[in-house]
């Protein structure tokens, strides 16, 4: 007897019908491997419960050969477990077609099979299926797909960069925004949009070890991306041959990777579509030598098509270091440092001319001569129009110059000066007497920046002698919190021990409601603490964070920040302030800094305030100044030499002012315009906010929850609690937690309550729920009674829902041109299509349900009459399908031709346009047009309506 599965047999997936016809490749032990050639996907299933249905056609069925000729089946043979079909082709010739040669694009009329088998569903399920198809089609066509679902306020420059970069094939770019402008969010948006569109399916994220947790939190909380964090322990403990092959998104610390050659080999072997490198400016490169970290990233960049480098601004880095980043992206274009320097110098006068145009609205004779020399005669007409005040000509001139910018397509750099929306900062300093207990610490310890830690570690103290009972900063904190009453206050200190001690102090000494947040807590515990702090009515007044514990969190609903101590590096200070100082902060940031007089704390405060001006403004020069003056700074924090100290402060202040002046004069306004989007980002923001205000998603989700047996109840304003009910239909529904979850559709609520799921059309719960509806068969049949006086009792109407779709690899992004769309046909007894006159919702309002037994009895009695009418429906709907396909082909051809023309022209004046981009675009066009030619109609659902 033949085995159940044989290589070559054709099966269809019950849960992923969109994959097309599958072919059994192998049966290995308890695993079954099936290839889906239409999409290039391979799946492995457990042999005992594989969700597959055998494809077996019957006499009378019309089937298609992979070379696209058709035959009508007359006989079916089973030869060693494989089916062989015999029948007649279009020329009425006898032909044979083994199942191994069936077209991969054959569609199945499962709705018809279920209808005549008596599997008739509720009317609510039929409506849910139709609405799911409609929403899926709408979202796939949306320009916001992959941009609107992030848990963040929509910000113009971030959205512009994300769309511009994510819509490229294998993007290779440098994201170099100033601190606080959201490079991590930009990278997350690019990753998210590339994954949703299919342009990328495997992403590698390389970060410094101290940023791993921040990235993990950002990707999971903001984007719902399940990133796998790899370190030496996880890599060694994995049972897989190559642990990296088992994950779609890998987060890896560069420090570990450089030291582990086995991990490097596995990483290279795994294959990736996109690599993201954070803090790329720390990769050291010189003309004669590169660091191990740089060399490793360089080797990866050679084999990974898409590369995103997140880095400091070019002005901070210096030209040589900036060149080192660019050569990672395109070593052929950026191969000679001297040539790059010369090119940059040649371009500087053009950037200055644009600065003049933007500042004054017109161009001097010298600036016009500069632009003429850069654009040639073709720019003269634009210059003439600009001189008459033509705003459109001004925009076109800037675009022409940008297209010729040496790094305009690969570098995105926004500055705080160019981006609006940041709050002001106000500093409150509180010098306090240093307690004698700290002065009596062992020699050498009293100079510590964190004396409370030294006191606890060097003293065998009782509960009554703990440091927070005598430290004046604690008294000051209690008094300040009482003065601010119920105002939310964020406190940050360097160590987790200090944070926990402060919580104890507030509880014991004041009763002020407080919660703590540190690296020793897991993500769930941190979420609860953040939620307790965010709750306006019953929450904590104060949240006490350690340095590391607050990474990646956003507390901008608060605007009072207490720096209980000061960090040892200005970048860490900026990170602390950045918890509140973000775009969208509605209040002035109130910075409260208590410090102990005549201590290293006092001098460090003076260094940050007087030398670096780091409290009242961001300090882009802080890292350079710390590096330059650090060797002199640290000893003087401990020394009492006032003259040397004041000399250091004065020198550092002068150097900062000089560097800031260089940064300002070196600003490339043309590049800022490109990075900001010149209005395109604002349009995206408006569209996302409009989408947020619509009620279609909550209405749809309520019907989805009802269908699957998910109970929902009010939690608070704009929030719901979801729990699985006893009648839950499918345990695989992606609720996220078996015990239940709290959700909100409100973006502002989600930003302040990170314990709540932010539900958008892109959320895994929504996408997973919709997939369950469409991949299953529930709702593809229904029978109803229609109450309409215009219809004679007993009249039978037939409502047929077809899906017009193309089965193709997601990377081709054909969903933008031909998304799966529900085409509706409403046939009367005479074969007339009434769908254009009677909408789906209008019809629904006239229907009543029919008991299943009665419905089944009616269908069986009417089978012979219904079958030809169902077949006739496809003829009625085919012109609509053909029209959609033709329009999709036209749009695809037009879009790619326009982009090819633009890039080809651009390549002539800007070498950063790679040949590979043009080749990939042409290939994508040809493959896309060929796939659209195979687009098919599929009968998705049937509803039989009987007038009564």
Swiss-Prot record:
- For whether the record's keyword set contains Transcription regulation, the answer is yes
For binding ATP, which residues are annotated in this chain's numbering?
A: 177-184
**Family matches, as SMART domains:** DEXDc, HELICc
Q: What keywords were assigned to this record? A: Activator, ATP-binding, DNA-binding, Helicase, Hydrolase, Nucleotide-binding, Transcription, Transcription regulation
GO BP annotations, alphabetical order: regulation of DNA-templated transcription
SUPFAM superfamilies the record matches: P-loop containing nucleoside triphosphate hydrolases
Q: Which Gene3D superfamilies match?
A: 2.30.30.140, 2.30.30.930, 3.30.360.80, 6.10.140.1500, 6.10.140.2230, P-loop containing nucleotide triphosphate hydrolases, Tandem AAA-ATPase domain
**Segments forming domain Helicase ATP-binding:** 164-332
Q: Does the keyword Transcription apply?
A: yes
Query: Per its UniProt record, what InterPro entries does this chain match?
Result: Helicase_ATP-bd (IPR014001), Helicase_C-like (IPR001650), Helicase_RapA (IPR023949), P-loop_NTPase (IPR027417), RapA_C (IPR022737), SNF2-like_sf (IPR038718), SNF2/RAD54-like_C (IPR049730), SNF2_N (IPR000330)
A GO molecular function term, named singly, is: DNA binding
What's this protein's family per the entry? Answer: Belongs to the SNF2/RAD54 helicase family. RapA subfamily.
Described function:
Transcription regulator that activates transcription by stimulating RNA polymerase (RNAP) recycling in case of stress conditions such as supercoiled DNA or high salt concentrations. Probably acts by releasing the RNAP, when it is trapped or immobilized on tightly supercoiled DNA. Does not activate transcription on linear DNA. Probably not involved in DNA repair.
Q: How does it assemble?
A: Interacts with the RNAP. Has a higher affinity for the core RNAP than for the holoenzyme. Its ATPase activity is stimulated by binding to RNAP.
Protein known as: RNA polymerase-associated protein RapA
């Amino acid at each position: 007897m033949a085995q159940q599965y044989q290589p070559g047999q054709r099966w269809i997936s019950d849960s992923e019908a969109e994959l097309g016809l599958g072919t059994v490749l192998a049966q290995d032990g308890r695993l079954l491997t099936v290839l889906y050639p239409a999409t290039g996907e391979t799946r492995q299933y457990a042999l005992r419960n594989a969700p597959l249905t055998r494809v077996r056609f019957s006499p009378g069925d019309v089937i298609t050969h992979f070379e696209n000729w058709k035959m009508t089946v007359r006989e079916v043979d089973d030869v060693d477990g494989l089916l062989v079909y015999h029948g007649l082709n279009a020329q009425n010739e006898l032909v044979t077609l083994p199942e191994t040669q069936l077209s991969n694009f054959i569609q199945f009329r499962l709705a018809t099979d279920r209808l005549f088998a008596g599997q008739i569903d509720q009317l609510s399920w039929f409506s849910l299926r139709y609405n799911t198809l409609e929403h899926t089609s709408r979202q796939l066509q949306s320009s916001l797909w992959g941009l609107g679902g992030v848990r963040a306020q929509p910000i113009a420059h971030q959205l512009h960069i994300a769309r511009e970069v994510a819509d490229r094939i294998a993007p290779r770019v440098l994201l170099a925004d100033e601190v606080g402008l959201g490079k991590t969010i930009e990278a997350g948006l690019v990753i998210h949009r590339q994954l949703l569109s299919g342009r990328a399916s495997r992403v590698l994220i390389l970060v410094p070890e101290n940023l791993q947790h921040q990235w993990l939190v950002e990707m999971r909380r903001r984007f719902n991306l399940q990133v796998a964090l790899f370190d030496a322990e996880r890599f060694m403990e994995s049972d897989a041959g190559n642990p990296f092959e088992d994950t779609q998104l890998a987060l890896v610390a560069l420090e570990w990777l450089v030291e582990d050659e086995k991990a490097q080999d596995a990483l290279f072997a795994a294959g990736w579509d996109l690599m993201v490198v954070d803090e790329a400016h720390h990769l050291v490169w010189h003309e004669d030598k590169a660091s191990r970290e740089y060399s490793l990233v360089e080797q990866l960049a050679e084999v990974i098509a898409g590369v995103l480098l997140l880095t400091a601004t070019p002005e901070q880095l210096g030209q040589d270091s900036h060149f080192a980043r660019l050569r990672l992206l395109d070593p052929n274009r950026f191969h000679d440092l001297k040539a790059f320097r010369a090119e940059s110098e040649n371009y500087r006068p053009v950037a200055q001319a644009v600065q003049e145009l933007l500042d004054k609205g017109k161009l001097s004779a010298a600036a016009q001569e500069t632009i003429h020399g850069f654009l040639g005669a073709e720019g003269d007409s634009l210059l003439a129009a600009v001189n008459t005040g033509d705003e459109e000509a001004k925009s076109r001139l800037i675009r022409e110059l940008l297209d010729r910018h040496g790094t305009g397509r690969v570098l995105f750099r926004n500055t705080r000066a160019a981006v609006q929306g940041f709050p002001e900062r106000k500093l409150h300093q509180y010098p306090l007497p240093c307690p004698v207990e700290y002065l009596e610490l062992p020699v050498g310890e009293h100079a510590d920046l964190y004396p409370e830690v030294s006191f606890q570690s060097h003293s065998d103290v009782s509960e009554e002698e703990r440091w927070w009972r005598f430290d004046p900063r604690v008294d000051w904190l209690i008094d300040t919190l009482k003065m601010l009453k119920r105002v939310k206050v964020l406190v940050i200190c360097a160590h987790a021990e200090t944070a926990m001690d402060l919580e104890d102090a507030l509880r014991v000494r004041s009763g002020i409601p407080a919660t703590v947040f540190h690296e020793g807590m897991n993500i769930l515990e941190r979420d609860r603490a953040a939620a307790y702090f965010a709750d306006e009515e019953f929450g904590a007044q104060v949240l006490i964070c350690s340095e590391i514990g607050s990474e990646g969190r956003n507390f901008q609903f608060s605007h009072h920040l207490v720096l209980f101590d000061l960090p040892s590096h200005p970048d860490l200070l900026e990170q602390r302030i950045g918890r509140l100082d973000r775009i969208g902060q509605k209040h002035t940031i109130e910075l409260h800094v208590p410090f102990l007089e005549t201590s290293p704390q006092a001098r460090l405060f003076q260094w940050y305030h007087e030398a670096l001006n780091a409290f009242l403004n961001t300090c882009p020069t802080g890292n350079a100044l710390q590096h330059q003056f650090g060797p002199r700074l640290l000893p003087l924090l401990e020394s009492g030499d006032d003259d040397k100290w004041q000399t250091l402060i004065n020198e550092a202040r002068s150097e900062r002012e000089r560097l800031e002046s260089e940064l300002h004069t070196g600003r490339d306004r043309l590049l800022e315009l490109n990075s900001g989007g010149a209005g395109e980002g604002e349009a995206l923001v408006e569209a996302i906010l409009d989408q947020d205000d619509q009620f279609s998603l909550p209405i749809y989700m309520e019907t989805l929850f009802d269908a699957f047996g998910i109970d929902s109840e009010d939690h608070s304003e704009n929030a719901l609690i979801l729990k699985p009910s006893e009648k839950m239909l499918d345990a695989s529904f992606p609720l996220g937690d078996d015990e239940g979850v709290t959700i909100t559709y409100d973006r502002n609520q989600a930003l302040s309550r990170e314990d709540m799921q932010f539900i958008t059309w892109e959320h895994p719960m929504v996408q997973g729920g919709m997939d369950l509806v469409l991949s299953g068969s529930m709702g593809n049949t229904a029978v109803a009674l229609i109450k309409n006086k215009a219809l004679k009792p007993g009249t039978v109407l037939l409502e047929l829902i077809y899906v017009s779709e193309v089965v193709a690899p997601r990377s081709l992004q054909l969903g933008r041109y031909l998304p799966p769309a529900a085409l509706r046909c409403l046939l009367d007894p005479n074969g007339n299509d009434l769908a254009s006159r009677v909408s789906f919702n209008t019809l629904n309002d006239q229907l009543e349900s029919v008991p299943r037994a009665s419905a089944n009895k009616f269908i069986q009695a009417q089978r012979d009459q219904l079958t030809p009418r169902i077949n006739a429906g496809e003829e009625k709907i085919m012109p609509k399908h053909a029209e959609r396909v033709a329009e999709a082909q036209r749009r695809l051809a037009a879009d790619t031709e326009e982009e090819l023309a633009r890039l080809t022209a651009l390549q002539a004046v800007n070498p950063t346009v790679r040949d590979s981009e043009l080749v990939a675009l042409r290939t994508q066009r040809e493959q896309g047009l060929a796939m659209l030619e195979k687009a098919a109609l599929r009968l998705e659902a049937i509803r039989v309506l009987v007038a009564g």
